[in-house]
Amino acid sequence: TAGLIGDTGTTSYGSSKAALIFATKTMATELGVMNIRVNALAPSLTKTDMFDQMEEKARNKILQSTALKRPAEVVEVANAALFLASDLSSFITGQVIRVDGGLTT
């Protein structure tokens, strides 16, 4: 979600994520004529090894800003990817699906 919201000290990281969002939207318009869909996921904190290595204060700050007050499970992010890869999303392209528990709400 760093490409969708700003935060102190995240200029480089957020800019790189925003560039991926732009690339997703641009590629969707370029490849749509070939029936190729391009979408992206924007997950927030996800329970991974990286999550476990975060400073507790930083982790809690983000979790308190999240509507669901918890990190995503890896399977929850994977399920969003499976949806986008399936025929259930056949008319979705150029979108950024926020799997963020309400962080960017």
Where are the regions that the model predicts?
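Active-site helix of classical SDR
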Residues: 16, 24
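Active-site "substrate specificity/gating" loop of NAD(P)-dependent dehydrogenases
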Residues: 4-10, 32
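A short C-terminal helix-loop "cap" of Rossmann-like NAD(P)-dependent dehydrogenase/epimerase domains
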Residues: 52-66
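Active-site segment of SDR-like NAD(P)-dependent oxidoreductases
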Residues: 1-5, 103
